[in-house]
């Protein structure tokens, strides 16, 4: 459903942010 799609999108964004912060600058 729509809510599920939004949740997936937010989860993906969150994962990307966590990955970026985990990478050495």
Curated annotation (Swiss-Prot):
The family database entries (InterPro entries) matched by this protein are listed as: Frog_Litoria
GO BP term (any one):
defense response
Q: What is its main location?
A: secreted
The keyword Secreted appears for this protein: yes
Can you tell me which family this protein belongs to?
Belongs to the frog skin active peptide (FSAP) family. Caerin subfamily.
Q: In which tissues is it expressed?
A: Expressed by the skin parotoid and/or rostral glands.
State what this protein does.
Acts as a male sex pheromone that attracts females. Has no antimicrobial activity.
Sorted alphabetically, which Pfam families does this protein's record hold? Antimicrobial24 (PF16049)
What is the official name of this protein in its record?
A: Caerin-2.3
Query: Mind listing the GO molecular function terms for this protein?
Result: pheromone activity
Q: Which domain of life is it from?
A: Eukaryota
Species of origin reads Ranoidea caerulea
GO cellular component term, pick one = extracellular region
Cellular localisation? Secreted
Per UniProt, which keywords does this protein have? Amphibian defense peptide, Pheromone, Secreted
